A protein has these predicted regions:
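C-terminal beta-signal and adjacent terminal beta-strands/loops
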Residues: 137, 518, 852-857, 877-925
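Solvent-exposed loop segments that connect transmembrane elements
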Residues: 247-283, 323-368, 413-464, 516-541, ...
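N-terminal periplasmic "start-of-domain" segments of outer-membrane beta-barrel proteins
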Residues: 48-81, 133-144
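Outer-membrane beta-barrel transmembrane strands
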Residues: 184-187, 203-206, 214-225, 280-324, ...
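Outer-membrane beta-barrel signature, preferentially recognizing the C-terminal barrel domain
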Residues: 376-378, 586, 590-598, 656, ...
Length: 925
């Protein structure tokens, strides 16, 4: 396969060759400059900071001395912020945005994903100590739906961090994988501590006001090194429990009025075929207990000044059992089938309606889903070696392995129907929660389920959803890097290296459960229950209700306090009536396996002159991709699996090899002692998301099997995302803790991943067609296209008076794609405003973060946007003695509303998660 040099690659190669060719006498000060640079780098590594202002100055120093455009957060700075995982801390960096969900499940109260410069989370690479980390998601939609390259930061507590380096421009020596940039989390090492013995511990409580629960939080670290500093051991552990509650109103898709529907034939003005109406409107109550436990260890050996050996590891396990209830308006049964007594139509959408039917109608449907044992996990083991072979030649090695998973072993489900003679809804615009009501009693169970007067198409106690879900993720890597001091003109040194890795991601043996009786109508239900068609003895009695303050702050009118089943009742109900046959209910459409073998090599030259420095380099990468997934066939083909209720499936294998050349150049011009001017150009790449390469086919309900349905799927032929990036920045260091910077960037994403439509015939199963029927679908699938992103970032921090100071930054971003679809993750503006105070015994910080609306992905075959959101956090610390202090922290103090809407300016969801308060005692020795 031939590889063609891009313009950036050619420029970098010429610059590097020219630098090598310059005679040594061209700059007699090269050796002193190199020595000064090395000393400067060593000084940065050995900085020990305490206090807010000292840590901010340390971050400023590291940014100032870096050869490329970076932002740095130190452990002390993170510790003085009201942050509970690394993503919370990164939210304060200009150009970095966070989201509190992995995909389209809606946000929670903790930061989850990190993205840079107006792109999606998958285009930002997360490293720990320079290597990748395997990860997993606890939420079922993140496990089977949006399965991206991004890391879940809910597994990364802030306590494990020594520093975080945000690379806004690329270098050849950096591991490839971040189109927009990369984030390197540096963990603590025992020989870095000043004292021979370091002990620190924190114990505290967290109160979450919406669930009204208090839980314990604990963290401890012990670091020891011998007196001569040649051997050290560090052990750290954490255990953090929290209760979550999320109140929400969800609009789950839209259906279309057909010409044959009664509502279209009634002759009412504006109520015609083609008008869309909400499929489901629900009041969704999510409850969860999260327990994050784990720790780190580090063994560091330095037998001489020339050799350092380090073995380190990390483990984080998150138990995330949850229950999701949704009491819903059943628009699918009303919008076309019932003629409204009053209504409004706006821009082709039925935005409100009232229905009256004395004979009764199926006005609502109620889903209760318990996910016991849900969770996520991440761990790694890494060995690093540093060898100063000669005065001029240094070698470093890295060998490691990382594993992770996300799991949902079972979903215990019950779906019941709500009969009524009156029902109504109102959508209330794209930025507000929808409302709905019926004249049924929501607070008590009453006679639930099947009633021939209402409808028997959807029976009582229906069971659905995938189970036996465990997404395994792993990576193994080996790396060898060299650095040779040249001191030839402006060329200070040459860096070179090679890296090999294997990444694997898989999900096999998914079970698409259903009820024990395939046709769960009145007769089958009665047979299963051992009674008449009106006998509901199978249904357990209600065990409780929604909280009385559910939905406070959402400004929606909803049925009050729906009755509930307990998780134990749902488990018992499913144990008796769920069909989880691993053969007949095998859901092969959700299975996939992916393996990537990557080989990379690079050459980089570090440059330095009298008032400038920089680097140029080239990284060559080969990716061998092996994707396996099942393809559905309407007619069985030779070798197909034909035992699944979901149709005929054949295993499909796709292999590709991709070669990429990634040049880079970074230059830092020192205009004077206070001002730096930086320029950078690079070509970057990120491999396609796992769900894009091997995504399962998912489709919505079909009212008429003779019409064309819609759904989504994957594309194993996707090429990696590549981009030509350009960056310039101006930095003005005005004094202690005082700096201003402005930067501009442009990304020409030459191989972005967008969406297109393909036509397929699939085996469709519903209650009316238990054995399946061939239905045509238009599936939205990912394809390679192109995009452009550009923006400007401003940052300012300064002391004000006494112990007071302020930090502020603003990012302005714009993007476009070749197919004119919105670009994932682009917020036109985001900003952070912060203030701090510090003296010998008291420190305080106040932080306001804002992010404007952005495209979040596809949900129910429609573009899905998150509305603008802001959050307020604060921390207060009181120092009792040198070894003991207390902190009080608050997160989400403004009780932010998370709003989502569709591309057609219709509401999708509104959520509130409440506020969280942390009281913690810290001890150190």
């Amino acid at each position: 396969m031939k590889t063609k040099l891009t313009p950036i690659a050619a420029a970098a190669a010429v610059a590097l060759a020219g630098a090598v060719a310059v005679p040594a006498f061209a700059q007699t000060a090269a050796a002193p400059a190199a020595a000064a640079s090395a000393a400067k780098a060593e000084e940065v590594q050995q900085v020990i900071v305490t206090g807010i202002r000292a840590s901010m100055q340390s971050s400023i120093n590291q940014k100032r001395n870096a050869e490329s455009h970076v932002e740095v957060l130190t452990a002390e700075d993170i510790g003085k912020l009201p942050d509970k995982n690394v993503a919370d801390s990164l939210a304060h960096v200009s150009g970095v945005t966070i989201s509190s969900s992995s995909g389209t499940e809606g946000g929670f109260d903790e930061s989850d994903r990190v993205s840079m410069r107006g792109t999606g989370p998958s285009l930002t690479q997360t490293l720990i100590n320079g290597h990748n980390i395997a990860s997993g998601d606890w939420f079922v939609l993140g496990q089977t739906g949006t399965v991206g390259r991004s890391v879940s930061y809910t597994l990364l507590p802030s306590e494990v961090v020594s520093s975080v380096v945000v690379h806004k421009t690329s270098e050849a020596s950096l591991v490839e994988g971040g189109v927009a940039g990369s984030i390197d989390i540096i963990t603590r090492r025992p020989l870095e501590f000043k004292q021979s013995l370091t002990v620190s511990a924190s114990a505290g409580l967290v109160y979450s006001d919406l669930p009204a629960k208090t839980d314990g939080q604990f963290n401890a670290l012990v670091g020891w090194k011998n007196d001569v500093g040649t051997f050290g051991v560090l052990v750290q552990g954490f255990s953090e429990t929290r209760h979550l509650r999320r109140d929400g109103v969800e609009v789950l898709g839209f259906d279309t009025i057909q010409a044959t529907d009664p509502s279209a034939q009634a002759g009412l003005p504006g109520l015609v075929a083609g008008v869309k109406y909400p499929d489901l409107i629900g009041e969704a109550l999510f409850l969860q207990e999260r327990k994050r436990t784990g720790g780190t260890f580090d063994l560091e050996l330095k037998p001489s000044n020339d050799i350092t050996l380090d073995l380190n590891g990390f483990l984080s396990n998150q138990e995330a059992t949850n229950i999701n209830r949704n009491y819903m308006f059943f628009g699918r049964k009303l919008g076309g089938a019932q003629v409204p007594t009053s209504y409004t139509v706006s821009d082709g959408y039925l935005t409100s309606a009232t229905y009256d039917n004395a004979g009764g109608m199926m006005a609502g449907i109620y889903d209760q889903i318990s996910r016991p044992g849900a969770g996520s996990h991440s761990q790694y083991l890494d060995f690093d070696g540093k060898f100063q072979v000669t005065d001029k030649f240094k070698l470093t090695t890295q060998l490691g392995t990382s594993t992770g998973y996300g799991k949902s072993p079972n979903q215990d489900v019950a779906e019941t129907v709500v009969g009524a003679t009156q029902a109504s809804f109102s959508l209330n615009g794209p930025h507000n929660a929808a409302s709905w009501a019926t004249n049924a009693t929501s607070t008590s169970q009453g006679t639930v389920g099947l009633n021939s007067t209402f409808n028997t198409d959807s029976g009582d106690g229906w069971i659905f959803g995938d189970g036996n879900i465990k997404v395994n993720d792993s990576e193994k890597w080996g790396q060898l890097d060299g650095k040779y001091d040249i001191e030839a003109g402006p060329l200070v040194d040459l860096k070179f290296g090679a890296r090999g890795s294997r990444h694997e991601r898989s999900l096999w043996n998914v079970i698409g459960q259903g009820p024990t009786a395939v046709n769960w109508g009145a007769a089958d239900y009665a047979a299963a229950c051992g009674g008449a068609t009106t006998d509901f003895r199978c249904i357990p009695p209600a065990s409780g209700n929604y909280p009385s303050n559910f939905g406070k702050g959402l400004n929606a009118t909803l049925p009050p306090m729906p009755w509930t089943f307990s998780p134990a009742q749902l488990a018992a109900y499913n144990a008796q009536y769920a069909n989880r046959d691993p053969v007949g209910r095998a859901d092969y459409s959700a299975d996939f396996g992916l393996k990537e073998d990557v080989e990379a090599a690079y050459l980089q030259g570090d440059l330095e002159g009298e008032s400038w420095s920089g680097n140029v380099g080239l990284r060559a990468v080969r990716t061998k991709e092996h994707v396996q997934n099942y393809e559905a066939h309407a007619v069985a083909q030779p070798g197909d699996i034909t035992t699944s209720a979901f149709g005929n499936f054949g295993l499909k294998t796709t292999d590709h090899t991709y070669n990429d050349l990634l040049p880079s150049a970074n230059f830092n011009l020192k205009l004077n002692k206070e001002m730096n001017l930086r320029f950078a150009a690079s070509r970057t790449m990120t491999r396609a998301d796992y769900s894009q390469l091997a995504g399962s086919i998912a489709y919505g309900a079909v009212d008429d099997v003779n019409l064309i349905g819609s759904g989504t799927g994957g594309n194993p032929d996707l090429k990696p995302v590549t981009s030509n990036n350009f960056d310039s920045s101006f930095e003005w260091y005005l004094g202690q803790n005082n700096m201003f910077s402005v930067s501009a960037f442009f990304m020409d994403v030459t191989s972005y991943i967008g969406l297109a439509s393909v036509h397929k015939t699939l085996n469709y199963i519903d209650n009316a067609h238990p054995n399946g029927v061939a239905v045509d679908f238009d599936l939205t699938v990912p394809v390679n296209t192109s995009a452009k992103v550009h923006g400007v970032e401003f940052h300012y921090e300064a002391p004000i008076w006494g112990g007071f100071g302020a930090v502020a930054n603003l990012s302005l971003t714009s993007s476009s794609t070749a197919n004119h679809d919105p670009m994932l993750g682009t917020s036109k503006n985001s900003y952070n405003l912060g203030g701090y105070f510090e003296n010998d015994w008291l420190n305080a910080r106040l932080q306001w973060n804002h992010r404007s609306s952005f495209y979040s992905g596809q949900d129910r075959n429609s573009a899905y946007f998150q509305d603008a959101t802001s959050d307020l956090s604060a921390s207060l610390g009181y120092t009792i003695s040198k070894n003991f202090n207390i902190t009080l922290e608050g997160r989400n103090l403004n009780k932010p509303k998370l709003r989502y809407y569709t591309q057609a300016d219709q509401p999708r969801a509104s959520y509130v998660n409440g506020s969280q308060y942390y009281l913690t005692a810290h001890f150190s020795y």
